[in-house]
């Protein structure tokens, strides 16, 4: 899986075959990475030395050019982030690297023991020092500062300590030139694979609870905890990738493979935890309303990048800029239309709608307007009392800036930017007016958009 966070890697993959790459490309990337390392803050001598070793291997083993090119691409995109001092960027840099390793070698064990593994290990050292400790603490504290949760708070201190101790221990052990069996036993005792699972499991529980909540504040908390969960899973994988390389260095192949397998299983578990986000059922529409539109939220955009890495299927087909027919699921012969009523313009369900008649336009912030295209220009807006009024204003305001929440059965639910938890539905009356209902209105509020 190639993430949009890896712009260099996109370019490299387009010009590199599965086994071989252009020497001019790899030389260009070597120069860029070397320059970035020299300009970066902190001590990067080990990384520069490992880079020289990689240069030598490329010269003597042409078949490694393609793999080296891909890894240099992922490292190049990560370097600025790892040295940024910003926790979110640092974790994004970790994601670049672990994704590059997974894509190129299938995991750290696939790199073998050589210049590429030494180079990657030296780059990971930029993270597995104080950056790991500070990044974990920063993202946990950021999430908990927004949402009070005593149970999560109790486990947070232990999680921060586990990450800090493990990363510091790995960093020290990497300085050993020859690892003995005794050293490997000490590593196993001090960095157990399961050590980070408790807090991550607590977050999984909160995400599960928040998925079906009817509280808007709880739904917002769940989405923030989803981002924290993704960040911690990636940082855990980064530490364990470094640990697997360390075991390979000590010729403990079976242990390195076991660590890598644990990472693989946890990646699958993360995909299972997050899968519902792109396969929502109506009872999960509220968390979907916080998550969508994805382009309107930095949190949602970050989560989407992580879901791609974990292998979660893509979001269902997005709504575009064109006319659509909105057909009700409960009354499946009725679609949205408009009428004039006592000087007001109302939207209702009509049985004679044959062609797409609602123009949907995406706004710059990711939300949409819904405009009747059959008569004079009318925007659907949610009135304070829930009615679906038509307004002649060019900009209907956040009452008429809509979000579309895709459901797993192909239908959509619709709510406004101002009231994300009030969903558009067709009422049970002779007129079939379009109104809004708090939380899931049932099939009367599920729409086929064609």
From Swiss-Prot:
Subcellular location: Secreted; Nematocyst; Target cell membrane
PTM: Contains disulfide bonds.
GO MF entry, a single one: toxin activity
Entry keyword set: Cytolysis, Disulfide bond, Hemolysis, Ion transport, Membrane, Nematocyst, Secreted, Signal, Target cell membrane, Target membrane, Toxin, Transmembrane, Transport
Signal peptide start and end residues: 1-18
Any GO BP: monoatomic ion transport
Example of a GO cellular component annotation carried by this entry: other organism cell membrane
Superkingdom of source: Eukaryota
Known role: Has potent hemolytic activity. Is lethal to mice and crayfish. Causes cutaneous inflammation in humans. May act as a pore-forming toxin, disrupting normal transmembrane ion concentration gradients in susceptible cells.
General remark: CrTX-A and CrTX-B are encoded by the same gene. However, they differ by their molecular masses (43 and 46 kDa, respectively). In addition, CrTX-A is primarily localized in nematocysts, whereas CrTX-B is only detected in the tentacle without nematocyst.
Family: Belongs to the jellyfish toxin family. Type II subfamily.
Protein name: Toxin CrTX-A
